[in-house]
Amino acid sequence: PYPPYVIDSAHGKGYVTDMVLLIFKKAGLEAEYKNVPFKRALAEIERGNFTGLLALSPGREKYLFTENSMGYFKNQFFVRADSTWKWDGRSSLEKVVFGGILGYRFDKEFIDPHVEKFKGDPERVQLIAGQDALQRNIVKMTMGRIDVIFDDSLAIAYAAKEAGVKEKIR
């Protein structure tokens, strides 16, 4: 899940999921949405069990099943509200513990190389997986276990609100 885009709740499945299912229905096609962790979704696509993903990051275009985008993410850095850290190029990542989600691609030029280089060093990079990975990373950040995360601003706002820590991050 990647709320508010993709979610599985009593209130709906997220606006991207609802839109895609409606498009398929209007085209007379049957479609099913399965809510699984991102890394598993990638593996199921590679095995031929899933047809596509609803939310993609750069470098994952081969999983796209439409020619047109239906929306865009606005990725940015987030820190604790009391943090003085600011992005000032690649070297600024050297001073913090970066938290991310296993299987995600962030940014080919700066973040991905940093994650690849330090993914085995929990003092530099901590990657987690699971249905609530984004919310857990936000909570880890508010507790001081990681210093910075990089993700979509709407997804962060939603997850932080759900975790009750929206005022503790910026």
What are the language-model segments listed below?
Residues P1-I7, R90-K108:
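Short loop->beta-strand "edge-of-pocket" segments that line small-molecule binding or catalytic clefts
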Residues R40, E46, A55-L64, D147-R170:
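A ligand-binding cleft/hinge motif common to bilobed small-molecule-binding domains
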Residues R80-G99, P113-H114:
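Flexible hinge/capping segments at coil-to-helix
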Residues V20-L29, N68-M70, G103-Q131, I138, ...:
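Ligand-binding cleft/hinge of the Venus flytrap
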Residues P1-Y2, S57-G59, R80-S83, I101-Y104, ...:
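Solvent-exposed coil/turn segments that connect beta secondary-structure elements
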Residues F65-F78, S91-E94, R170:
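Short Pro/Gly-enriched coil loops immediately N-terminal to beta-strands
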Residues V20, A41-E44, L134-K140, I146, ...:
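Short, hydrophobic alpha-helical packing/hinge segments within bilobed ligand-binding/sensory domains
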Residues P1-Y63, G130:
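Extracytoplasmic small-molecule ligand-binding "clamshell" domains
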